[in-house]
Design a protein with these regions (language model features):
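Short amphipathic alpha-helical coiled-coil/interface segments
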Residues: 137, 141-145, 345, 349, ...
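SF2 helicase catalytic motif II
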Residues: 392-398
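P-loop NTPase Walker
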Residues: 1-117, 244, 355, 359-373, ...
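ATP-hydrolysis module of ASCE/P-loop NTPase motor domains
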Residues: 90-97, 116-192, 308-311, 317-321
Length: 399
């Protein structure tokens, strides 16, 4: 007899007409809930197994999940051998869409790549396109990047010259190559590459007057705020714990509390801006001497905690090494170089894509981007193909 579901699991099985996230530890039964939810549709509502798109993260997981669904179906047929609808599912389980995102995108492209049209050089992706493995893609990227850099050096702009000089390019191109490939990797992670590139250009064309208004400043201030709060809480809890030890309470606890108050002040100042936070001084003096016999095991633990928080605060000094005006000036000085880097990466990306099209090949990122183009129009609305594909499925489940 199947193991009974918990109340929370049963609620996840029964929920309808809304998106649902099941979050739990590994091995707690999330896949089991998915299988039970799937069969709740089949048994209660007359659905078929191939009415659903079920996404997994690896091909092995997809195969394993199909096996679990087939096993669950067999168990149900044994309990109800006369159920014709269940017998039909034995045929459907092997044609149900249980696959990875990559496999889904590949199938979608092979069926509909004619809708993408040709690129600027007249190359179109054909249904028999080949998916490059990572080694092939890397070799091709390196070849295309070498040609791209040759043309970059032949037509250097002032920004390009600053970029090359800053990275020591010309003598050793490895730093520039690595930077272009790193930015290209980030570009490939964006659903709309051109829009992302234009957003980066817009930032560097008009750097804000305050560093806290830049993405970098916001990230750094949030990091300082989070770490200051964490260290403050650690020190305050430690001071409270040291009340149980007279020697530590007398020698260590006051310093812990003083540092925690300074960290609390820093946490508050991060909301006021860069320079306000930069102006907060936090002292971590040498702790007073405490005999091991008086401090016991707690002494070593508290000393370690103090040293860890002290190291964290040292990192704040590095972050706030420059004032807001100085940091903004540094960004503006590098703006032309950054714009040149963005344009260089965009040129490399275009050439790389054209070379893949010429070879009738695609990498994993291409499949996802082209699938988005097929399913979502330039205005952000679903395409006709999107509506057709959507109509195939009653629900999308992700394991």
């Amino acid at each position: 007899m199947a193991e009974k579901l918990t109340n929370e699991q049963q609620a996840a099985v029964d929920s309808r007409e809304r998106s649902l996230l099941v979050s739990a530890a590994a091995g707690s039964g999330k896949t089991k809930v998915l299988v039970e939810r799937l069969f709740s549709y089949v048994e209660r509502e007359g659905a078929n197994l191939d009415d659903f798109l079920i996404i997994t993260y690896t091909r092995a997981a997809a195969s394993e999940l199909r096996g679990k669904i087939a096993k669950a179906l067999t168990e149900r047929m044994e309990r109800d051998p006369g159920n014709y609808h269940l017998r039909q599912q034995m045929l459907r389980v092997y044609r149900a869409d249980i696959k990875t995102v990559d496999a889904f995108c590949t199938a979608l492209l092979r069926e509909n790549c004619h809708l993408l049209g040709e690129d600027a050089r007249g190359h179109a992706l054909r249904p028999d396109f080949r998916v490059l493995d990572e080694n092939e893609a890397q070799v091709l990227r390196e070849r295309v990047l070498a040609r791209t850099l040759d043309d970059f050096y032949d037509c250097l702009t002032p920004g390009g010259t600053l970029l090359a000089d800053t990275l020591g390019a010309g003598r050793d191109d490895s730093a520039l190559e690595d930077l272009v490939l790193e930015l290209h990797a980030k570009l490939q992670a964006q659903p709309y590459e051109d829009k992302w590139l234009e957003a980066q250009r817009a930032f560097w064309r008009a750097v804000p007057d305050k560093i806290e208004d830049t993405p970098y400043g916001k990230i750094l201030l949030n990091e300082v705020r989070r770490k200051a709060r964490h260290c403050k809480n650690l020190l305050q809890r430690a001071a409270q714990e040291m009340c149980a030890n007279d020697a530590l309470n007398q020698k260590y606890a006051p310093a812990f509390l003083d540092a925690s108050y300074q960290l609390e002040a820093l946490e508050g100042k991060t909301a006021e801006g860069w320079d306000a936070a930069r102006g907060v001084t936090i002292a971590f003096p040498r702790l007073a001497a405490v005999k091991d016999s008086d401090g016991g095991e707690m002494k070593a633990r508290m000393k370690s905690l103090w040293d860890n928080c002290k190291e964290t605060v040292k990192g704040f000094a590095e972050i706030f090494s420059a004032s807001s005006d100085e940091a903004v000036e540094d960004l503006r000085t590098m703006a032309s170089a950054m714009l040149a880097l963005i344009d260089l990466t965009a040129d490399f990306s275009r050439r790389y894509n054209e070379e893949k099209r010429r070879r009738n090949s695609a990498d994993f990122s291409d499949q996802e981007h082209e699938a988005i183009r097929l399913l979502i129009g330039e205005d952000g609305a679903p395409t006709e193909l999107s509506r057709i594909v959507s109509a195939r499925y009653r629900e999308i489940m992700v394991d």
